[in-house]
Amino acid sequence: MLNILSIILILFVSSYDKSYGFEKTMNKIDLETYNWTKRLLVINLKSQDKEKLSYVDNWLFANKCIIEDRNINIVFFEDFKNKKYKKPPFLIDFGFWLVGYDGEVKSFSLEEKFVNEIFYLIDQMPIRQQEMLMYKKKC
């Protein structure tokens, strides 16, 4: 009888933990909500990687207008975690992902200098080519 009660208690506790974890992720935003509205630069850095973070911060500050002009949303993950966003399926390493309007990964790099290439990569995309014809540059 004691064994049966122990098993029931273990099953109850384990299902409670799983549902609690599920509730925590339910409130997070899925990056797919940005499909067809934003391009994404998804960055996943190690918490102790201060040099890369500083490099990216300086790049963001220097390129604010260009980032806005190309309709890019920057999403940071630290050690695969983000309080606001769900972890996307492609986030299996540390690095930098450029995600297009269609939600597909267009390019990936482990190196922070990749951020310097994304404007060129975006400007080669067909939708961006149309945007450049239709809209006046802001920067």
Give a label for each model feature.
Residues 2-139:
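Non-catalytic interaction/Regulatory regions outside core domains
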